[in-house]
């Protein structure tokens, strides 16, 4: 039953990442609206509607599919994709043509990913991009604060008490970002 829409709404989108050899890789992102949770990502050089359909099924195994799927009108979401989504019992919510602001959480995630990570790293190939994305999503999920989540991360963190002890720096995303924790002396 789909009663609370925000907990059952998922946004998807693609972003293009050039490699050092100017080859284009496409990143498929699935983002939950409730706590801006990055549910799934995958990388391919040749996205098709069939591939995207298989990937959405991979993102939601068994009976974990959301009620609503928000996406743009890109041709990549063709008949094979729509059929797979329908078989999973998901209702599609389409944005208006040329209206990226109607998919704000996915667009914001992609913008943050670019500004905070991809603009500072050279991508060599698909394997290196997967490695980079895995590290960034780990950082995004567990360490990066979000004002809309009251400065918490999508995966909620315990607040450390102010006690005597040294503050240690924990590098993340290959040293691009850092997390700080108190450790007992």
Task: Give, region by region, the residue ranges found by the protein language model.
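Charged DNA-binding/catalytic regions of mobile-element recombinases
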Residues: 1-185
């Amino acid at each position: 039953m789909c009663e609370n829409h925000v907990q059952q709404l998922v946004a998807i989108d693609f972003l293009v990442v050039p490699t050092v050899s100017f080859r284009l890789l496409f990143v498929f992102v699935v983002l939950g609206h409730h706590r801006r949770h990055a549910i799934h990502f995958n990388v391919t050089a040749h996205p098709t509607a069939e591939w995207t359909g298989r990937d959405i099924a991979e993102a939601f195994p068994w009976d974990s599919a959301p009620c609503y799927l928000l996406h743009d009108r890109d041709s990549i979401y063709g008949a094979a994709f729509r059929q797979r989504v329908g078989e999973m019992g998901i209702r599609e919510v389409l944005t208006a043509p040329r209206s990226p602001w109607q998919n704000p959480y996915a667009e914001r995630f992609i913008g943050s990913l670019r500004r905070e990570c991809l603009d500072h790293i050279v991508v060599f190939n698909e394997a290196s991009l997967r490695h980079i994305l895995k590290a960034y999503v780990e950082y995004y999920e567990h360490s990066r604060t979000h004002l809309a989540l009251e400065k918490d991360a999508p995966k909620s963190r315990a607040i450390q008490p102010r006690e005597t002890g040294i503050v240690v720096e924990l590098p993340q995303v290959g040293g691009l970002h850092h997390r700080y924790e108190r450790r007992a002396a």
